[in-house]
Amino acid sequence: MNDAKKYIVSVLILLVAGMFGGCIKEDYSDCPRPFRLTVRAWDADMQDITETGAVQRVVIFVFDETGRRIDRLMMDAAQVAARKPIPLEYDGPTTVSFVAWANPDDHMLEETANVQNVKDLFFRLSSTDGIAQSPGDLFSGVLTCPIEYGSIEQGTDQTVDIYRRTAQVHIIIRGYQEWLDANGPRQLPDYADILLGETPDTYTGLAELIGNAVQYRPDGQIQNGDFISPIFRVYPTLDTTPLHLKLYAYGQELLNISTGSDGVPFIPVIGKMLNIYIDLRGANLNVLVSVTPWDVVQQQQYAEY
């Protein structure tokens, strides 16, 4: 190839690059301005908890104004805690929406990995026969912002705020073993069961509750005859409907409790701890219910330990 042909080819390459790149050196009117995105986490009391380590990982779906996915970003715990910005540049859309979900489990990440439209984005609990696995400490948030054009200079930095989407539950049942023994002999390995429900099993990407009703099985232990659950998480109920705690023995539902002895209902509060204390000893059933801050168990429930 002679020099003249090389020159012509070079000019054609530059012209094509200019047509598809959108940014011509003499005119930046079609150029999107680069910008940076950070994630900020809040608790239920609107305290900034970004640096506490509560957020272990974040997946951020980026949608254009039509709802079409144009990007998918991941951040780890260290990046979130350090408030590390993500450098971004999107050429084409007039606005973008960042839909961020923190602490999804591997199943949720796998289910959402290939979602191409915001209307198809769901965070569904794993469940078997209507019994759901307790979710992780989920956060989510949405930020919609315009894409700035007309310059290659740094654009406006953006922050997507994320908030908790689950409630915690802690259960103590005093005299549980004695109550079981009083209701018949142990004939089967699954002679006893405790279920708490119901809640929807699905969040949309925009944090709307939908889906099927599910229950949760607290994975507790019997200590000194009392049932004590670990702290576990649930999705909230629809329209602040109370949860029902059902106690089974030998395949039969023997107790169904949804309020404290004072009439306070078992309503899970997003970002808070629902404490349920049941005393099966004595002639009268005694039930206490309280709501405390995240990770704070009602200490009076341990007064007799």
UniProtKB/Swiss-Prot annotation:
Location within or outside the cell: Cell outer membrane
Signal sequence interval, chain numbering: 1-22
Lipid sites, type S-diacylglycerol cysteine: C23
Gene3D superfamilies: 2.60.40.2100
UniProt keyword Signal present: yes
Membrane topology: Lipid-anchor
Alphabetical UniProt keywords: Cell outer membrane, Lipoprotein, Membrane, Palmitate, Signal
Domain of life, source organism: Bacteria
Protein purpose: Anchoring subunit of the major fimbriae. Regulates fimbrial length. These filamentous pili are attached to the cell surface; they mediate biofilm formation, adhesion onto host cells and onto other bacteria that are part of the oral microbiome. Fimbriae of P.gingivalis are major virulence factors.
Quaternary structure and interacting proteins, as annotated: FimB is not part of the fimbrium itself, but anchors the fimbrium in the outer membrane. Linear, head-to-tail oligomerization of fimbrial subunits mediates assembly of the fimbrium stalk, while the minor components FimC, FimD and FimE probably form the fimbrium tip. The anchoring subunit FimB limits fimbrium length and is important for solid fimbrium attachment to the outer membrane. In its absence, the major fimbriae become very long and are easily detached from the membrane.
Family assignment from sequence similarity: Belongs to the bacteroidetes fimbrillin superfamily. FimB/Mfa2 family.
Note in the entry: The name (major fimbrium subunit) does not indicate the abundance of the protein, but is derived from the greater length of the major fimbriae. In strain ATCC 33277 and strain ATCC BAA-1703 / FDC 381, major fimbriae are 300 - 1600 nM in length and about 5 nm in diameter. In contrast, minor fimbriae are only about 80 - 120 nm long. This length difference is observed only in a small number of strains, including strain ATCC 33277 and strain ATCC BAA-1703 / FDC 381, and is due to a loss of function mutation in FimB, a protein that restricts fimbrial length in other strains.
Identification of the protein by name: Major fimbrium anchoring subunit FimB
Species of the source: Porphyromonas gingivalis (Bacteroides gingivalis)
Name of the coding gene: fimB
